[in-house]
């Protein structure tokens, strides 16, 4: 199967390299911005990508909602499988994209958007075939988890913990989606879509860690507790689904507190 790649940044280049050694897959054309010369087999329009002979799948590595959404719809309507790790795209337009994929009988795959290297969404999609999911949630953002742990174990202030996370590559140059809880909210929304075949879009609440200070941490620890940013979703009245993200206090011995810079998901 020949796979086209949209974008040739760190993620796109990594996908292209992986395709060279993946059994049953073949490197296809790469969509890049005009003037970007370092991409192999490059094309500068989605029309050229879709017209390329033999392309059966498209892997999106651009990020953001547009033009990723327009490109995704074009690929699906052209009968191409579409793969993405773009949680913002899926959270905003997942229902439309899934419907377009079903109409054409192709795959719309987004497991990489939640859980990092864990095949969480794939396994969840299998579980819902035979089990009722009463609720699910957990620690879905490694950046904030690292920061909270640094503030608690190493007595760093918020700004110091954020700077440390950026230096080590946990946090991006613009960490706002992470620290505000928006990244975790997008991931729990995707999880809810798989678990309940419904996107919770109304009245979603997310509280991040920006307001947590070193003094807060001292008071929390004095009570034998520890803080983690938790996401949760489940069925609600009226056939709806709830989803939220907020800091939660746990006993310091709780399993959640042993997770330092990774994710933890419970169903």
Q: Language-model segments: which ranges?
A:
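Substrate-binding/catalytic subdomain of NAD(P)-dependent oxidoreductase enzymes
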Residues: 162-255
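Glycine-rich adenosine-cofactor-binding loop
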Residues: 2-17
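Rossmann-fold NAD(P)-binding glycine/threonine-rich loop
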Residues: 87-108, 121-124
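Short, ordered loop/turn segments at secondary-structure junctions
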Residues: 33-35, 63, 87-89, 95, ...
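NAD(P)-binding Rossmann-fold cofactor-contacting core
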Residues: 22-39
């Amino acid at each position: 199967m020949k796979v086209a790649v949209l974008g040739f940044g760190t993620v796109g280049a990594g996908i292209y390299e992986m395709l060279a050694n993946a059994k049953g897959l073949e490197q296809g054309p790469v969509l890049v911005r005009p003037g970007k010369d370092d991409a192999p087999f490059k094309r500068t329009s989605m029309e050229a990508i879709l017209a390329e002979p033999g392309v059966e799948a498209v892997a999106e590595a651009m990020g953001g909602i547009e033009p990723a959404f327009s490109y995704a719809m074009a690929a699906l309507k052209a009968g191409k499988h579409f793969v993405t790790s773009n949680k913002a795209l899926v959270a905003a337009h997942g229902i439309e994209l899934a419907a377009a994929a079903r109409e054409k009988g192709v795959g719309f795959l987004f497991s990489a958007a939640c859980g990092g290297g864990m095949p969480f969404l794939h396994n969840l999609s299998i579980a819902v075939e035979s089990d009722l999911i009463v609720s699910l949630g957990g620690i879905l953002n490694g950046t904030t988890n690292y920061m909270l742990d640094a503030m608690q174990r190493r007595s760093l202030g918020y700004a110091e913990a954020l700077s440390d996370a950026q230096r080590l590559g946990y946090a991006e140059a613009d960490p706002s989606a992470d620290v505000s809880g928006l990244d975790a909210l997008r991931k729990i929304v995707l999880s809810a879509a798989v678990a309940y075949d419904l996107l919770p879009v109304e009245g979603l609440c997310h509280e991040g860690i920006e307001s947590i200070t070193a003094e807060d941490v001292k008071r929390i620890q004095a009570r034998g507790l520890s803080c983690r940013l938790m996401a949760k979703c489940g069925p609600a009245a009226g056939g709806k689904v709830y989803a939220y993200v907020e800091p939660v206090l746990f006993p310091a011995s709780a399993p959640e507190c042993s997770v330092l810079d990774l994710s933890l998901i419970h169903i």
